[in-house]
């Protein structure tokens, strides 16, 4: 089992534990154990569908006898009235898995929809939209999957798969040069092949990075579009560039047209609205 699947399985198990506890007494009290039925996932809002594959895992993990028929796959554009899948099996199982499946699919689809909207805003530029670590605790793997489904690019998954020297790291390390030098020495000593990105707050810090080198990407933190254009010119294609901080949907293209390679948007995962859908007997 790979790490991603292990995280998803643990999330599903924890979610069932917190929701069902010692039993779904509503369902157990009024639905016979032998009752069989089927329910459909009905889309009620236009957007990008995400989470179908995870939903299948929710059903399989709770009750392997449930039969799932998928009509619309992850990444597809959906409209109100569409039926994404039909699930058949024990009615008790349908009722006990309904809320977890909807919670996951609505959130993932909301993230994919917003990401798609942001990436569409960048059409005609080479800039790609990035997610961040501003995710729901325990759900990061699903939220980052949704960003990819929506057409965005995953930044680092966590603190373990990339070195990102933020302002606090630089300040505590004693400056740009010490932060970069120590990061490179650490990777060499530990045998880690990690990309190094550094955040700069002004042109002086940017020039220090350019003079020292040793990084893969430079992040411009809270730069205006005018500052960003100048910063991109200073970098001159030597390193990947990223804009971050206070960038909204309305200002997104202004930054992209400055020539940055990436724009990171925390709102993709921390301020998203779930896509409306329901799971009803059919």
Language model features: what each stretch is:
Residues 1-212, 217, 226-234, 239-240, ...:
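Acidic/glycine-rich phosphate/pyrophosphate-binding loops and surrounding catalytic core
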Residues 138-140, 245-248:
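Active-site glycine- and acidic-residue-rich loops that bind
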Residues 278-282:
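Active-site loop ensemble at the mouth of alpha/beta enzyme cores that anchors a bound cofactor
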Residues 220-221, 241-247, 265-267:
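Glycine-rich beta-strand-to-loop/alpha-helix junction loops that act as flexible
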